[in-house]
Structure formats: structure tokens, C-alpha cells
Amino acid sequence: MWLLLHVILLTEVKDFALADSSMVAPLCPKGYFPCGNLTKCLPRAFHCDGVDDCGNGADEDNCGDTSGWTTIFGTVHGNVNKVTLTQECFLSQYPQHCYCRENELECVKADLKAVPKVSSNVTLLSLKKNKIHRLPVKVFSRYTELRKIYLQHNCITHISRRAFLGLHNLQILYLSHNCITSLRPGIFKDLHQLAWLILDDNPITRISQKSFMGLNSLFFLSMVGNRLEALPETLCAQMPQLNWVDLANNGIKYITNSTFLTCDSLTVLFLPRNQIGFVPEKTFSSLKNLGELDLSSNMITKLPVHLFSDLHLLQKLNLSSNPLLYVHKNQFGSLKQLQSLDLERIEIPNISTGMFQPMKNLSHIYLKTFRYCSYVPHVRICMPSTDGISSSEDLLANGILRVSVWVIAFITCVGNFLVIAVRSLIKAENTTHAMSIKILCCADCLMGVYLFSVGVFDIKYRGQYQKYALLWMESVPCRLLGFLATLSTEVSVLLLTFLTLEKFLVIVFPFSNLRLGKRQTAVALASIWVVGFLIAAVPFTREDYFGNFYGKNGVCFPLHYDQAEDFGSRGYSLGIFLGVNLLAFLVIVISYVTMFCSIHKTALQTAEVRSHIGKEVAVANRFFFIVFSDAICWIPVFVVKILSLLQVEIPGTITSWIVVFFLPVNSALNPILYTLTTSFFKDKLKQLLHKHRRKPIFKVKKKSLSASIVWTDESSLKLGVLSKIALGDSIMKPVSP
């Protein structure tokens, strides 16, 4: 029966491998896939999205990854063993707490300490979850008709070399979840018909070829969760019919060219979650029938270029979660029948479309980043289907993001243009400060232009983004947008720091001569723009070191929090955000705290303390909102960068929310905080409105200097705070004792 099963499986393998080539499908453009037997083609984004876009449901068929032999094996095995049993018991002798049905006996959780005596015609014996610790000599010798034995969860520590003597008809043996430390040579020598041997979750540290002596018909060997550090020199020497081997979650450190040399029948090989560091080039050369290979979660850093050259029938390959440093361009060139390829958590710096082109039957691929999916336009299902920003359909995958990018861009541009216009029309006493504010608004306007551009390209690629994703991220417009966003961000940060320090000197040291003149201020502002330009332009100077610095995501912003990013890109991004920007943020926070403390101290020293309470509250409120807006903008970025340093996995959606919602906060709020809400602006606006409403009846006469009220634009208290200060009280002298 098991030989028949083996023949069926091999037939299924070859038929399944050729199935796709026999199907006639319409020719579709790159990135599009057929709707079954219809002439209609749809892009990848419309396949397996839960919606019948084809009209015949073909776009929602075969969405699950059923390649490999798990499904085929389960189906065939299920059909062979599907037998309906009656409730009648054919056993005359068995323990009281056991359940009998025909010739099968289940003694689960029966508190047994040894194999019980039962009728010799038993065919299935289940002794799971008992207290059996030893299997002595000939313990099953009376039960020559046994076909299945289940001994899981017993903590068996000792198995006699002759424990299974005489079980010539045994087909399935479960010894998983026990305390077996070794397999003695010849322990299975009488089990010539055994097809399944399951030894999962045992502390077995070593096995040899002689451990499996006699297993001529073994089809399935599972040793998951053991403590193996090495495999026998030739694993299949005593198991010529071995078809499926599962050695997951062990401590295997190496495999050699001879390990699977005699495993001609092997179709499934699982070796995930081990400690394999290198796989020799000829390791799998004899596995001509291999259909599924899993090498995931090992320590493999390098793969020989011809490692898979003999695996012509391989349909499923899993290499995910390995610290691979390089993937050869022709690594998968011979895998013509491959249908599923898993490369999750693997950085491929030399990725190209040619690397995957030979795999014509590939239907499922799993890659590290959504960006990589643009290199496999011929694959129907590519995961991840989004990077949190973009999807296969749209540059901005989230509907909220699509709307918000326009709203925030509009607020940012209109607010800053309004401030520039108003500041140009209204004459202020402090012209240098007004100039600084207008320059700040220019920098913030660039962020609005960046967001508008992202919105425009989102509309341009709507519904077909994946088709153009690679071209877009490598394009000049994308790089220019990234440059523009970085320039805006850095110039804005440096300008805010400059303005903060300028006011810090005015408030904390009111009697010093540390003041910048108009020319000095102009030089400082020009220098800030030059520095910001250089910071944003440096990645263009060495593309071999920085890579495509601005083209790592659809919005072209260089947050770079992924561990596997190019070292140059990631290091430079860290230098910008955790170097320049974090330092600037700390300077701003400390300066405002010091300024508030200085104002508070000065107020307490005046004679009219109560008159200053309301003013202090106003100052405190405005200082709070200035610092709070900076915190909203930068703290999320700092947290993300610090978490990336700690190697914490960060969801891809983070970038989109930071770029659309958090980073533009300062650009959108700066006009409000520094101009539109100030008393200076309000009063000047009222004056302009009055001029348009009525003609002046009389001219205001000049008053004496001591009683005059002077309008000041940020001249004494804070950045963005304007107030009327009587000149006589503006210099707050200490109260004499």
C-alpha cells in the first residue's frame, strides 16, 4: 500500500509540475494576468483582492499558496486511509479505562505505567498521555497485527533494542513528546513496513545510519524540536524510500555533499530554524525529485551559485530569515518549475528583474519589502502587498492619506504664503526678525510643494502603481521630491533654532550687546540655506555608498529605519535625524524653558506682581505650543530611529503617517504660532480694516516719550509673542528693598 502511495505521489509531482504548461492562457502585458479562459487581463492589484473583477471569479481562484507537496501528500494519504469504523469491539481483553472500536484501542490519560496486556488481534494501540517511562524487550511481540502505535506524551526515557521485535506489519509509529535521548542501532530493524516515524520534541542529540536500520519502507521521518547538531554521513542509507524529512528546530550546524547522497526519492526536505551556516554546492545534486525545500531561519550567509541547479522539479523554496549577504544573479536560473519562493527578511542589494525572469511558473513570491515587488511583474501574487504607504494599486494606499496629503499641503502653502504677503505689506519695527520669519515661511512652503507633488503623482499612478513603482522610485522626480522634503525639513529646523537662540539672548541677557544686525542676520540666514542644501545634496555625490537614498519608498522620504538598508543610507539618515535634528530640538526646548524661567523671575521682582500674572500665563501658553508643535513633529521620528537602532521591527505604515501627518506639523503651524495669532498681527490687521472702512478724522498727535506705547515685534518676550509694553515698564527693574 505504501509503495503504491509512493508511486502515486511521484506521478502527482510530475503531472502537477507540467500542469501549468498545458493550460492555454491569453497573452497579457507585463504586470497583467489572465481571467482564466477569457481574453480579459487584469493587473496584479485586482487579483486575490476579494472582489470578482473578471466576472467569472478567475481572479479570486488559486490565491492560496498550495505549491509544494503538503497538500498533495495530505490528499493522497487521506484517501488511502479513509475507513469508516463501527462501534463494535473485536477485542476480548483490554484495560477498563480504555476505549475499543473494532480492532483499535485507545488508552489516553489512563494513568498507565506500562504497556497493558490486550488481545493479540489489536491493530491500533493509542497510549498517549500516560506515565510509561520504559519500553522493555518484546513489549509488543504478541501484537503482530499492529499497524499503528501512538506513544506521545509519556516521557519515555529508555527503549530496549528489541522493544519493537516482531512488528512486521507496523506502518505508523509516534514517539513524539517523550524524553528519548538516543536511538540505539537496530532499534527499528523489524519494522520493514513502517511508513511513518515521528520523533518530535525529544532531547535526541545524535543519530547514526544504524539508528534507522531495517526501515526499508519508511516514507515520512519527522524529528522536529530535537537537539541534533549533525546528521549522519548519508542520511538515507537505511531508508531508500524516504520521501519526506522534517528536521526543523534542531541545532544542526552543517550539512555536507554526502548528507543526502542516497535520498533519491526525497520530495520534501524541511531544515528550518537550525544553525546551518553554509551549504556546499553539491548538497542537493542527487535530489532529482525534490519538490519542496525549506532552509529558512538558519545562519546561511552565502549560497553557491549552482546550489539549486539539479532541482528541476522544485516547486517551493523557502530561504527566508537568513543573513544572506548576496544573492547571485543566476541563483534561481534552473528552477523552471518553481511556483513559490520565500525571501522574506532578506536584503537583496543587487536585485534585478533578470534574477527572477527564468522562473516562468512562479505564482507566489515573498520578499522583504514592497519595493522589491516591482522587480517581479510576471508573478501574480507578491507579498508584502503594501509597504504601509503604497499598494499594488496606488502610491498612497490609505484613503485617509490620500485626502490628508491634499488638506495638509493646502494649509501649509496657503498659511505660509499669507504670512509672507502680510509681512511684506505691514511694516514692522524689527525688520531683521520679520525677514527671518519670511525666510522660515519659504522653507515651510517647500514642504507644502512636496506634499502637493506626492498627491499629484498618486493621482497619476492611481489603480496601476505597481506597474510603474520601480520606474517611479528610481526616477529623477522622486529624487528631487526627496531632496525638496529634506531641504525644507533641515532649513526649517536650523531656522527655528536660530530664531530661538536670537530671542534667548534678548530675554535672558537683555542688557548685553549680543545682537545681530541686518547684514549679520542675512549672512546667517544664507548660511542656513547653504547648510540645508548640502545636507540634502550629499547623497547624490556617492550613489555607490548611499544607494538610491531618496527612492526607498513611494513618497521618496529618507527615513531609513530598516536594519537591512544600505549602511551608507541608514547611517546618514541616523546622522540627520538623531544628530542634527535631535540636537536642534534639545536646544529649542532648553532655550524656551530658560526663557520662561527668566521672565518668571523678572516678574516676581517687579512691584506690580499681579499685573504680570496674566502676561506670564500668556507667555507660558505660547511657549508651550511652540515646544509642543516641535515635539509632535520630531519625537515620533526620534522614537522610530532609536527603535531601529535597538533592532525592533517597525511596521511599514509608520513612514506614511510620519511623512503626511507629523513632519508637516511645524510647516503648517509655524504661520499660526509666529504671526497669525500674535497681538501685533491682530492689531495691524484691525488698523488696515479701519483704513478701508472709513477715512481718518484726525491725526494722532505725538505724545511724550514717557507715556508713549511702542509696538514691538518679538522684541522682548518670546518668539511669536507680541504685546504692548509701556516703555517705562519694559525694562523691569528689581524692587528696591
UniProtKB/Swiss-Prot annotation:
CDD domains, A to Z: LDLa (cd00112)
Disulfide bonds: C28-C41, C35-C54, C48-C63, C478-C556
Stretches of the chain found on the membrane's Cytoplasmic side: 421-438, 502-520, 597-622, 675-737
Sample GO molecular function, one term: G protein-coupled receptor activity
Residue span(s) of domain LDL-receptor class A: 27-64
LRR repeats: 121-142, 145-166, 169-190, 193-214, 217-238, 241-262, 265-286, 289-310, 313-334, 337-358
Keyword presence, Membrane: yes
Entry keyword set: Cell membrane, Disulfide bond, G-protein coupled receptor, Glycoprotein, Leucine-rich repeat, Membrane, Receptor, Repeat, Transducer, Transmembrane, Transmembrane helix
Pfam families: 7tm_1, Ldl_recept_a, LRR_8
Keyword Membrane set for record: yes
Family annotation (SMART domains): LDLa, LRR_TYP
Range of residues in the leader sequence: none
PROSITE patterns to which the protein is assigned, alphabetical: G_PROTEIN_RECEP_F1_2 (PS50262), LDLRA_1 (PS01209), LDLRA_2 (PS50068), LRR (PS51450)
One of the protein's GO biological processes: oocyte maturation
Extracellular face residues: 1-399, 460-478, 542-575, 644-653
Annotated membrane topology: Multi-pass membrane protein
Chain ranges passing through the membrane: 400-420, 439-459, 479-501, 521-541, 576-596, 623-643, 654-674
Coiled-coil region list: none
InterPro entries on file: GPCR_Rhodpsn, GPCR_Rhodpsn_7TM, LDL_receptor-like_sf, LDLR_class-A_CS, LDrepeatLR_classA_rpt, Leu-rich_rpt, Leu-rich_rpt_typical-subtyp, LRR_dom_sf
Glycosylated residues (UniProt): N37, N121, N257, N318, N350, N361
Tissue spec. comment: Expressed in embryonic and adult gonads of males and females, as well in male gubernarculum. Expressed also in brain. Not detected in kidney, spleen and heart.
Function: Receptor for relaxin. The activity of this receptor is mediated by G proteins leading to stimulation of adenylate cyclase and an increase of cAMP. May also be a receptor for Leydig insulin-like peptide (INSL3).
Family that this chain belongs to: Belongs to the G-protein coupled receptor 1 family.
Protein name: Relaxin receptor 2
Taxonomic source organism: Mus musculus (Mouse)
